[in-house]
């Protein structure tokens, strides 16, 4: 299969604002694109999604996604095949409007359609009310909410999407290309990251091409992703609410939403959860992810000199000759290049000075170090506050070994 890349210009995509100021900006999505290559590319992608079982790669504000119609099992299976994704790893569904989400949920409740449509606030009748503060504050954006599958005999999405569970996650992406594609195709898209399974998530179209060339028909190139890590996934169906996967919206931001969300906790995986009989509720809860070919060593609460000493000891214990290794280093706030031995072939990359910069650069830099042929990547850990929770979640899953130093 030939994989084509079509460039889209986000400046040409616009959305009509609602006439009612009290209405959510994306209660209904009306997209406007003048005749252009961008419009042709989006119409081509929408045609593939509607009329074939092949997935299409497209940019979101978090990472590039690989999408197919969440309602059609054969289309969803094509995502798993292209990525070589484990069958028990569920997918997140992407919608372009609250109206589209409402229609998707109502499709599973045919007896309730006429009754719900007569309600003045039908979105509140079908979407669990606990999520309304988050939807108002964070949608569109990098937040996924867990919804119930009420009738397993008539689910709103393919059972492949849910991995056979009684819940599924859904979000409304912020990226104009993602919103336009979902709106034009009028298809709720099941879309994990558009990379080969276990590889670092793609934040550029070329990352997608490197992993999935020959396996998918089309990549929409909308430039670099702005957030750089996947969405936060929350479960508000339990008390207290739980963050199942840290991501683009921080714990602190969610807790500031008030109500039940003030008590939000973070899911912590047990070692037993990683066994084969554990079925994750959302992506990112079970399998190793985000890993480059090089071996990643994560150092928590270590200075650069102490980290290098631990690394030398690690190589000695593994029987690895240090002089034959090419070493990459990812620094953030404390480490600096001058503190490492000058006689060793290090490749230094600075992830950034704050959480926003680090999340945006992390996956791209892991891929960059792979391209430079390093054997090991030494990574400076960060504090698990704000964006740091998602950063350390991703680094922990990418790392072969995590070294914990004394807390300061």
Curated annotation (Swiss-Prot):
Q: Which domain of life is it from?
A: Eukaryota
The principal location of this protein is cytoplasm
Q: Which reaction does it catalyse?
A: L-threonine + hydrogencarbonate + ATP = L-threonylcarbamoyladenylate + diphosphate + H2O
Q: What class of enzyme is it?
A: transferase
Cellular component per GO?
chromosome, telomeric region; cytoplasm; cytosol; mitochondrion; nucleus
Where does the YrdC-like domain start and stop, copy by copy? Answer: 39-249
Q: Which UniProt keywords apply?
A: ATP-binding, Chromosome, Cytoplasm, DNA-binding, Nucleotide-binding, Nucleotidyltransferase, Nucleus, Telomere, Transferase, Translation regulation, tRNA processing
The UniProt record lists the EC number as: 2.7.7.87
Tell me where it resides: Cytoplasm; Nucleus; Chromosome, Telomere
Mention one GO biological process in which this protein takes part, according to its record. regulation of translation
Enumerate the GO terms in the molecular function aspect.
ATP binding; DNA binding; double-stranded RNA binding; L-threonylcarbamoyladenylate synthase; nucleotidyltransferase activity; tRNA binding
Q: What function is annotated for this protein? A: Required for the formation of a threonylcarbamoyl group on adenosine at position 37 (t(6)A37) in tRNAs that read codons beginning with adenine. Likely catalyzes the conversion of L-threonine, HCO(3)(-)/CO(2) and ATP to give threonylcarbamoyl-AMP (TC-AMP) as the acyladenylate intermediate, with the release of diphosphate. Required for normal translation, by ensuring translation fidelity at the level of codon recognition, appropriate translation initiation selection and maintenance of reading frame. Also involved in telomere replication.
Question: Hey, which family's this protein in?
Answer: Belongs to the SUA5 family.
Write down what this protein is called. Threonylcarbamoyl-AMP synthase
Q: Which organism is it from?
A: Schizosaccharomyces pombe (strain 972 / ATCC 24843) (Fission yeast)
Which gene is this protein's source? sua5
């Amino acid at each position: 299969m030939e994989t084509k890349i079509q460039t889209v210009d986000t400046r040409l995509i616009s959305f009509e604002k609602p006439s009612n100021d009290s209405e959510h900006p994306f209660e209904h999505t009306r997209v406007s694109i003048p005749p252009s290559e961008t419009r042709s590319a989006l119409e081509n992608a929408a045609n593939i999604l509607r009329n074939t079982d092949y997935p299409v790669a497209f940019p979101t504000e978090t990472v590039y996604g690989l999408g197919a119609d969440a309602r059609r099992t054969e289309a969803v299976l094509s995502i798993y095949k292209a990525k070589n994704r484990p069958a028990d790893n569920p997918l997140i569904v992407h919608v372009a409007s609250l109206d589209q989400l409402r229609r998707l949920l109502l499709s599973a409740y045919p007896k309730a359609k006429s009754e719900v449509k007569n309600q003045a606030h039908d979105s509140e009748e079908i979407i669990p009310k606990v999520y309304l503060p988050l939807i108002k504050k964070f949608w569109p954006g990098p937040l996924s909410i867990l919804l119930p599958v009420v009738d397993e005999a008539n689910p709103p999405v393919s059972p492949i999407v849910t991995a056979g569970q009684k819940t599924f996650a859904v979000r409304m992406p912020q990226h104009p290309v993602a919103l336009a594609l979902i709106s034009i195709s009028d298809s709720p898209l099941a879309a994990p990251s558009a990379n080969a399974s276990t590889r670092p998530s793609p934040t550029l179209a070329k990352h997608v091409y490197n992993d999935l060339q020959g396996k998918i028909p089309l990549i929409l190139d909308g430039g670099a992703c702005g957030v750089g890590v996947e969405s936060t996934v929350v479960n508000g169906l339990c008390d207290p609410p739980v963050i199942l996967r840290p991501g683009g919206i921080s714990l602190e931001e969610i807790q500031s939403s008030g109500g039940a969300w003030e008590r939000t906790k973070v899911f912590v995986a047990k070692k037993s959860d990683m066994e084969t009989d554990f079925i994750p509720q959302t992506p990112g809860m079970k399998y190793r992810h985000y890993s480059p070919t090089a071996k990643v060593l994560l150092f928590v609460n270590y200075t650069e000199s102490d980290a290098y000493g631990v690394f030398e000891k690690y190589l000695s214990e593994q029987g690895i000759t240090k002089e034959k290794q090419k070493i990459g280093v990812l620094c953030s706030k404390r480490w600096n290049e001058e503190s490492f031995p000058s006689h060793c072939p290090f490749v230094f990359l600075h992830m950034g000075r704050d959480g926003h910069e680090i999340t945006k650069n992390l996956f791209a830099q892991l891929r960059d170090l792979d391209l430079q042929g390093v054997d090991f990547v030494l990574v400076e850990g960060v504090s698990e506050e704000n964006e740091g929770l998602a950063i350390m979640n991703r680094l922990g899953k990418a790392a072969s070994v995590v070294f914990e130093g004394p807390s300061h």
